[in-house]
Amino acid sequence: MKPQVLIEKMNESERKAFDSLGRYKFEMFGYWSSTWVKYNQLAFDMGIIDKKNPNPFKDLVNQAKNITDEA
């Protein structure tokens, strides 16, 4: 796979994840967000990027943790 194609796929996965979440498609959000994580790992392992990109879903994860801690 060409480096630029992998980066484009990673960007597409992020867009689709947030789009899915915004439309209450939670299962598809999980699919696309995990795809982004995998592409990020592949890009790093293949030397396409020097270090992993920050996870764009981290704030959502932290918010979910805060909600469950309050319950």
Write out the residue ranges for each language-model feature.
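C-terminal-biased regions
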Residues: 1-22, 27-71
